[in-house]
Amino acid sequence: MTEIEFKRENEYLSNVRELITDLIVDKNKSISKSTESIYEQKKFLWDNSSDYTDEELVGSMNEVDLNTKITSFDLIQLNKYKQSLNSPYFAKVVFEDKEYNEIMNIYIGICTIEKNHDYYVFDWRAPISSLFYNYEIGSSSYESSNGIIYGETLSKMQFKIIDGKLIRCFNSSLNIDDDFLQEILANSQSDKMKNIVSTIQREQNEVIRNISDPYLIVQGVAGSGKTSVALHRIAYLLYKNKSLNSNNILIFSPNDVFSDYISNVLPELGEENVLTTTFSDFAKVCLKPYKKIEGYTEFLEKIYSSNNFDKKLIEKKMSYEYKNEIDEYLENIENNIKFDHDIEINNHIIEKDEIRNLYLSKYLKFPYSERLDFIAEDICYKAHISLKHKNKVRNVIVKEYNICVNQFELYKDFLIKSNYLGSFISKGKVKYEDIMGLMLIYFKINGYPNFYGIQQVVIDEAQDYTYLQMEIFKNIFPNAKFTILGDVNQTINPFYKYKSLESLKDIFPKSKYIELKKAYRSSSEIIDYTNKILGISNIVAVRKENNYNVDIIELDESNKIYQVNSILNLMNKNNIHKIAIITKNVEEAKILYKNLENDNIQFIQNTDDSIQKDVIIIPSYLSKGLEFEGVIVYNDKETYKEDDINLYYVVCSRAQHMLSIFNEPQKILKK
């Protein structure tokens, strides 16, 4: 870029920032005025409510509600302007419209900056912005309200703007090794995930902007940006569908540490955070009165910290075969209810054959509980009993024919009759591996709790959910579209593994399967090492070499704390500050944390801990989905076994720039 061009871009930036400042001032005035007006409206209605009819009051309150919503929208817009002020845009496309022979300078940023129908910056989600993400120099097109606009992309440019100052301009064709992308990747330092709008790649954009497929299944390698893509997809859907709001979207997250880690992305994009839950927390809806349920992380801690469990039994409980066994058991229970006598209610004899017919024929398609309600209603009508006594009639039926509608009693009975020894409760909590069995019985009794308000479901780390869990999701959210993201190579559930996530098409038949094969997180040296762990070669490293080889160190038992501190110092000298010391389990992490005696190091041991310090100690299964500039794999006594190879892969693939490994578990590495 010439000096004259740079000066011209600087002037444009100044003009845009000046406009945003004016928009902020105007919006503040508007909000202040409307807030005061709403207060006066409410006060007037309160003071004079006796002068109005109920209809008039409802009409006036509706007007107040409308004004409140408008003000809320203005507050959101104000926040977007404030976020944009210091960096209004990140890219520019020069596009020639062939139909009108018009050359357009299209600046792209987090949100639209417009005044009097003149667009100074376009929202990255706008159709015209696809010119930046989808095309290089040459023929191109975008969708508009008037149809497809054809033309030619003459040039593309990316900007580095910090605190309102234009630092650098990059001529860009958005190749994967372009200078701008490499600079962004090299300097990504944060406690939390950041937005990637300025570096969204074409294969990622395909996922983000897909609105034609109801179900998306994304297989993405470690560091391919799966979670970032999912969050940007949410932001895009909120932009595209104005009837959609944050309460209509639900993310299933592996744990609360991860949920906290991703919590900044949507607000950075000018959107509210959406609903987030874990499978265990969500299951509580179906497992009352048990409020304590073992989380997935607790389950993994139990598995990776001891051998005190029945591997075959857990594998069975997570299999689809287990569902079939439960279905068979329930069908057998149902068919063996003895409708062997008539009952008398309110001086009316209800014949046993009639009740059998109602239960096993007329209302057979309904869940147990609903079936009993319908039967009780029928009997109330026949016996001339008020419907307010329906529950009493229902209780009579349950008692007379010994019909069990308690999911926990049924599950206990199933375990006993199937010779599956042991309780489904441990330390006062429902075991993770028993959640699905209990839920299946709950659904048989009560039906699926349909959450019709949820229109979009995002399932992250999908490889760690069983086929049965996926089927449950599909049934619970019948009206929702799904975005399912995972990586079979990062499966850390030792009892269940997909050969390919594409097999989920059996549950989601109208789905599109997409693979993300490029890794943006780790340096090529680290990618080479992690590829060797699994004996694979299909992962493409986007980061250039950074001249830090993977460091393999043998722990000296008498000097190990000194060794760890030496690596920490070495990383800091190389400008590596966001560091994770990752142990296999929490017990090993506790011992190391105690021995290091360093107040500048944070110990992450619970799922609700949030990362507050630059250096953390964290057990392997909590590190999933996170990334750090440097990673120290602390393996005190070579605790990784052959079955843990995917877990070891996950741990090593958290590193961006530097990876140091104490006591490399050579027994499990692929030859």
Question: How should each PLM-predicted stretch be described?
Answer:
Residues 238-457, 464-472, 480:
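Alpha-helical nucleic-acid-binding subdomain
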Residues 1-32, 39, 176-299, 631, ...:
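P-loop NTPase Walker
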Residues 256-272, 277-282, 288-296, 443-456, ...:
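Conserved helicase motor core of SF1/SF2 NTP-dependent helicases
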Residues 89-95, 435-443, 582:
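Short, hydrophobic/proline-enriched secondary-structure or compact coil segments at domain edges
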Residues 92-94, 156-158, 217, 253, ...:
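A structural signal for short, well-ordered beta-strand segments and their strand-loop junctions
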Residues 55-72, 206-214, 219-221, 225-235, ...:
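Generic detector of solvent-exposed, compositionally biased contiguous segments
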Residues 92, 206, 215, 248-250, ...:
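Beta-sheet entry/capping signal
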Residues 1-197, 201, 205-209:
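Extended, charged low-complexity regulatory segments
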